[in-house]
Regions:
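Bacterial N-terminal signal peptides
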Residues: 10-21, 455-461
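Boundary/entry segment of secreted carbohydrate-active catalytic domains
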Residues: 27-61
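Substrate-binding cleft and catalytic face of glycoside hydrolase catalytic domains
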Residues: 47, 51-195, 218-221
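Noncatalytic carbohydrate-binding groove/subsite architecture in carbohydrate-active enzymes
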Residues: 124, 158-288, 337
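Aromatic-rich peripheral "rim/lid" segments of glycoside hydrolase catalytic domains that contact
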Residues: 133, 147, 282, 289-296, ...
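Extracellular calcium-associated, cysteine-rich motifs in secreted modular proteins
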Residues: 356-405, 409
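C-terminal low-complexity, Ser/Thr- and acidic/Pro-rich disordered "stalk" regions positioned immediately N-terminal
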Residues: 394-442
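A cross-kingdom C-terminal cell-surface attachment/processing module
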Residues: 449-469
Length: 471
């Protein structure tokens, strides 16, 4: 089997970087870092501040703010949440979405009104009201969340474009020309997210200031390329997966976020507004796997100037349900009101040290493997003369080596089935708890079509586990 990854950068450009010996610069590109925080948010805001992150992503739910009619507003919970963020010197990315009953065109598939396509002419005026109220405090507005998942939006791409994105973007820019439109916030699950992004950019790319998406896939082990038996973070980010057997294509995944952006000539920055990994507090292996996943996300981000913001999912394990995506656990008896997982201390180290995040140290003392050679900081990385040295060495250009490069060719045996599993939610395998990998999923045998369908179902189940609670 050969797993061919379609690259966006030319081999000549990559070779030029290697020959020049230039490292992939990241300090010159400031990066934004934050957490998703839900409405019962005090602990989440505190954890975000304590991690040294500068942003929170909140849900400004339409059905809460305008529950009864177009004429009645209730801003109470959002005023408190936004003011709480500002009091902690945090910036806010507000997700404006979810349909109230009075604005629903129809409940096409059952399950309530919140994921319904809104009636024409209803969403834009609400976005105008949001921006007018908060533009002195909030400058970034994301238009809906994961509209390609039925849980959050029942419509087709054209419904999203016509009823949500275009009227919403026009409303933001009209009410606040300096404010930023972020979107479409697609989940990288299944085979259609690339098509969704293709349609949105084809119809309205000029209205987007920041392209956003969500990736929960894991990272392949060093030396294995960007994934052979399952989809990887790299394939969803920038280089989609094609599986060939004997020179015959047997599977092709969705185009990645960056490939679709390049197809449309989009030069707006990319923000990953959800990514993360579950970890049960007190389980050392899971906490370490979560820490490693966070580390890998930031290392990859710092080698890609076009990717300028990451919002992790999420700040804290919100009671009473057993959600474990957070980096802290609510505990009123603990100092600060929470108990921290390992990822929090790691983020404190990175944000206080790495210049791209406003830190005051260097690559050799920032907690990251900046040159992607498997060694972190002085003295482990022998290319660092001291902890104060400026550079760990040269990172492979994107799409090469351990930075998402093609995997070694394999010709023997049948192809492994493609997996579309939300790897961030899978329990860690024992061998995947060290720095070699961020998350692991077990591969299953079977025909490609059958397993692909099962994989999508599993991915949706895991996505719903993240989000089946009041946001």
């Amino acid at each position: 089997m050969r797993d061919t990854i379609l690259g966006r950068a030319s081999a000549g450009a990559a070779l030029a970087l290697l020959v020049s010996g230039a490292s992939v610069a990241h300090a010159a590109t400031p990066r934004e870092l934050g957490f998703n925080v839900h409405q019962s948010a005090t602990v989440g805001l505190d954890a975000t501040r304590d991690a040294g992150a500068g942003w929170v992503r909140i849900d400004l739910n339409w059905f809460d703010a305008q529950p009864r009619s177009a004429a009645a507003y209730d801003w109470t919970r959002f005023d408190a949440l936004i003011d709480g963020a500002l009091a902690r010197k945090l910036r806010v990315l507000a997700v404006v979405g979810y349909t109230p009953g009075w604005a629903s065109e129809a409940d096409r598939k059952g399950g309530g009104n919140e994921n319904d396509v809104p009636k024409a002419g209803t969403y834009g005026p609400f976005v105008t009201a949001v921006v007018e109220r908060y533009k002195a405090k909030v400058t970034h507005f994301e238009l809906w969340n994961e509209p390609n998942l039925e849980q959050f939006f029942e419509g087709a791409p054209r419904d999203y474009i016509d009823r949500v994105f275009v009227p919403g973007a026009d409303a933001v820019h009209a009410a606040c020309p300096a404010c930023k439109v972020v979107g479409p916030g697609l989940a990288s699950i299944g085979s259609e997210y690339g098509d969704w992004l293709d349609q949105v950019l084809g119809a309205a790319k000029g209205k987007l200031d920041i392209v956003s998406g969500h990736i929960y896939a894991g990272f392949p082990a060093p030396g294995s390329g960007n994934g052979v038996t399952s989809d990887s973070f790299f394939q969803k980010l920038e280089r989609h997966r094609v599986v060939e057997l004997g020179g015959v294509k047997v599977f092709e995944g969705s185009l990645s976020f960056k490939e679709v952006m390049d197809k449309h000539g989009v030069t707006a920055p990319f923000w990953l507004t959800e990514t993360g990994r579950e970890a049960t507090a007190g389980d050392a292996a899971q906490e370490e796997a979560q820490r490693v996943y966070y580390r890998q996300v930031l290392e990859v981000m710092l080698t890609r100037p076009w990717w300028t913001g990451t919002i992790f999912y999420e700040a804290f394990d919100e009671p009473p349900a057993p959600y474990t995506w957070g980096v802290v656990v609510h505990d009123p008896a603990a100092p600060g009101g929470y108990r921290a997982k390992r990822a929090l201390a790691f983020l404190k180290k990175v944000t206080s040290s790495q210049p791209a995040f406003g830190g005051a140290k260097t690559d050799c003392d920032d907690g990251l493997d900046n040159d992607l050679d498997g060694r972190v900081d002085f003295p482990a990385d022998t290319e660092c003369a001291s902890a104060a040295a400026a550079s760990e060495g040269v990172a492979p250009p994107p799409g090469t080596g351990n930075n998402g490069g093609p995997p070694p060719g394999r010709d023997a045996g049948p192809p492994e089935p493609p997996e579309e599993v939300d790897a961030g939610g899978a329990p860690p395998a024992a061998e995947a708890t060290a720095d070699a990998g961020g998350c692991a999923v077990a591969g299953a045998g079977g025909r490609i079509g059958e397993v692909g369908a099962l994989g999508v179902a599993g991915a949706l189940t895991l996505a719903f586990r993240r989000r089946l609670r009041r946001r």
